[in-house]
């Protein structure tokens, strides 16, 4: 019973991860990447602190959803034909690290919004924005480690389609170099999130079919082992 619940909860968390994350982002929004002084000053003057904090809260919920997904994936990939516990463990550690590094970034944004209401020097504001955006860029390295480790575990063990594993390896490597390449500020930075969404969605809506196949296989094995009677 516990495994059945977990096998639905984990993938569902992966499926909801991206939509909840994007919902929070659309609620609070950020200024442009590397904004001009005029743009940043205008954004700070018009942003609603209450709405911003609510959006940050929703986005934080989205970030946390990756934990049950990773925990489920950890158990799933270890069921493969070959031992993949080492990359699976690396994925789990990297996930916890990514969450720990990502959550404080939005709190820094919230602090900036709060202080701007009392007046804030634009150079100080730009410094905080630069730190926040650079910090987000560096989380791409950790996110890349998550996918790279997951991909290696999948390809090695074969518990999940190896196509998903190779896709994770490629996207993971790309995410690790996205900061230096400057692609962390483009839609390409969402590829890792899309992979989590796709895997979560597939295993959310396909478990019933998988159980039917397993049950059919078991019945065939039992039937084949019964002696013929007259």
Model-predicted segments: where are they?
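Hydrophobic, aromatic-enriched alpha-helical segments typical of multi-pass transmembrane helices
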Residues: 1-230
